Amino acid sequence: MSNEEFIRTQIFGTVFEITNRYTNLNPVGMGAFGLVCSATDTLTSQPVAIKKIMKPFSTSVLAKRTYRELKLLKHLRHENLICLEDIFLSPLEDIYFVTELQGTDLHRLLQTRPLEKQFVQYFLYQILRGLKYVHSAGVIHRDLKPSNILINENCDLKICDFGLARIQDPQMTGYVSTRYYRAPEIMLTWQKYNVEVDIWSAGCIFAEMIEGKPLFPGKDHVHQFSIITDLLGSPPKDVIDTICSENTLKFVTSLPHRDPVPFSSRFQNLEPDAIDLLEKMLVFDPKKRITAADALAHPYLSPYHDPTDEPIAEAKFDWNFNDADLPVDTWRVMMYSEILDFHQIGDPQINTNATFDDQVAAATVAAAEAASKQQQQQQHQTEEQTQQTIASTPPQAQVTPQQLESGANSNSNSNPSFSIGPDPANETLTNFANQADQYVSKFK
């Protein structure tokens, strides 16, 4: 698209550049990695949400994060997941994701009113239906919470914000989800967790929908663990044996033994089927936690359960890029190609269906060509500026190219000596060629 097709405006002090396809911009949310505005899509007359990714190419970490979110949004297509409808790159090289606009989120809804039983059931069913699909694709959401669950006026629910989503891998690192909804294995083991962390988060959300307030509102991770044990009791030996950190192990074993509180006592007004499902979702040992597929078949959700309409992903998500450490320019080329592939236009510089090492090799070469072209443009501009300077210099002060050449080749002390350095464009190409070899060999 040409620059004339973009409209620039300021929102919350942030430049927002969108194509003239979208009108009626209004801010609806601000996060650590982007600003979200509502808008009207003039092609469909439907409301949409437009998320601006802040400075996606400022660092390789941010570039990789944006690439991951884009790949996930392209791959995950399900009724209970937010759907990518458009994506574009602005003249300022910011990336914009366009998705469906939902009227509110579960966090806001819970602040305004208590939920009746049928709404709790229907919302939980849709959350688990979405998780079944996500987990079948080999993806963990990792940050499931009420504010990441969007709802429209028809009570249709969609899970959003896959920026933290990761590969289904038993060797994980670090704290990820918001504390209230964080599974105990993340706090205890740091490295060993899987799709079950999403089931724990969904269980916390289930309880919050029932009570209208968070179940485990920890002030910090120590307090968080403490109030979990107030309900579930001390962690079993099988869980303690998985703790990797010596300090964490000392802390857990130093705590006095606690017996679990029966859920029927804690949730006295809750029907037995709801209590049973909640108990199966909030289990200390992730290996014994119910799966999304089994939870959908639980009697509590029988009013909505339909095994013929609870699809799984057609293919596993390709996480081959996840351990790659690439320069920003390479991520940029790969992202551009993903955008072109989404729109099915143009000639992507790399084949997005190729193996990841082939994509890296192609992207590195493309980045080198772009760098070389930029270098040539800069060199051309410098030559033009030099010619303009010479043209404006008095004749007696001008130095001819022949004089420069004779000066460079002369050994006479009366003539200045000129040192001609390496060609920057050649250096750039050499560096990128070395990088290409390095990255290709890394993935062989």
Curated annotation (Swiss-Prot):
Its Enzyme Commission number(s) read 2.7.11.24
Annotated binding of ATP, by residue: V28, G29, M30, G31, A32, F33, G34, L35, V36, K51
Active site at D143
List where the motif TXY lies. 173-175
Instruction: Cite the InterPro entries for this sequence.
Output: Kinase-like_dom_sf (IPR011009), MAP_kinase (IPR050117), MAP_kinase_CS (IPR003527), MAPK_p38-like (IPR008352), MAPK_Sty1/Hog1 (IPR038783), Prot_kinase_dom (IPR000719), Protein_kinase_ATP_BS (IPR017441), Ser/Thr_kinase_AS (IPR008271)
Q: Which SUPFAM superfamilies match?
A: Protein kinase-like (PK-like) (SSF56112)
Chain intervals for the UniProt region annotation (Disordered): 371-444
Annotated positions of the Phosphothreonine modification: T173
Any Pfam family: Pkinase
GO MF: ATP binding; MAP kinase activity; protein serine kinase activity
Phosphotyrosine PTM sites in chain numbering: Y175
A GO BP entry is:
stress-activated MAPK cascade
Where is the protein situated, by its record's location annotation?
Cytoplasm; Nucleus
**Similarity-based family:** Belongs to the protein kinase superfamily. Ser/Thr protein kinase family. MAP kinase subfamily. HOG1 sub-subfamily.
What's said on domains? Answer: The TXY motif contains the threonine and tyrosine residues whose phosphorylation activates the MAP kinases.
The function of this protein is:
Proline-directed serine/threonine-protein kinase involved in a signal transduction pathway that is activated by changes in the osmolarity of the extracellular environment. Controls osmotic regulation of transcription of target genes.
What protein am I looking at? Answer: Mitogen-activated protein kinase HOG1
Q: Which gene encodes it?
A: HOG1
